[in-house]
Amino acid sequence: MYRDSPLMSTPVANDSRSDEGPSGKLSPTCLFPSFTCDFLDGDSSFECCSIDPLTGSHYICRRSPRLLTNGYYIWTEDSFFCDPDGHITLNPSQTSVMYKENLVRIFRKKKRTHRSLSSLLDPRASKSWLHGSIFGEVDSLPSEDLWLDGIRSLGSDLDCSLSDGWESQKPVTDTSESSSSGYILPQSLRESSQSSSLQLQVKASGHFEKNSLVHSRAGLMHKVSFQAILLAVCLVISAYTRWFVGGELASIFTCALLITIAYVVKSLFLNLARYFKATSCARFDST
């Protein structure tokens, strides 16, 4: 198998007649170069054995441009034969051309990464869930960013429209006054926004204080009711022990009940004092 042989090619006339003998015989170079390796090179050329009947000159064969670069000639011993006079005749039925095609994939699909079950169950993949930091790197939602950008753009458009209207009403000579007024208007808008934010903060703090007072009052009522019930139970037990049981056992029960009553009364007065102190501070802050 040989690559790109010059056979089966297009003949080109050669003007040189130096190789032609005086009796019209073929030159030695006309013989088929089957025993040389020069003709295997695709860029080399050799003289064919055919003669132009008009000029009597030999043809120089070159590689045909119609032959693809990936073509191969398959020669056998029966592909050509040479007569005693040196004429070479090709047998096309015994000479074949084989082309080796280069398959190129034009459309290449991107490989999708298929995660295996082991990678999904890897504890390192769920590290963010375990530490609770899956939303730690998220600063704000995209909707909030878009909302803030829209407010900024509206504020800038409002400032520009106000300044343009003010400058259109002023004459040309009062350019400095118009620029100063255009600078004052955004300041007034900023001051109004700051005052509104302060009012919102005051309202929120007042609402929080009211809620704290309500919760403290409910907790105090729960504690006071429990301590009052405990005090009443202690008094009833002391009276019954004094009435039905006498002697040293009654004195021991009475001493234990007095200690319990003292502890309950002390905690009750402390809770009442804290409650009245908190209410007075809240009223003073509200005024």
From Swiss-Prot:
Residues 1-25 are annotated as: Disordered. The keyword Transmembrane helix applies. The chain crosses the membrane at residues 218-238, 244-264. It is found in: Membrane. Its main location: membrane. Pfam families: TMEM71 (PF15121). It is a multi-pass membrane protein. It comes from the Eukaryota. GO terms for cellular component: membrane. Coiled coil: none annotated. Belongs to the TMEM71 family. This is Transmembrane protein 71. It comes from Mus musculus. The gene is Tmem71.
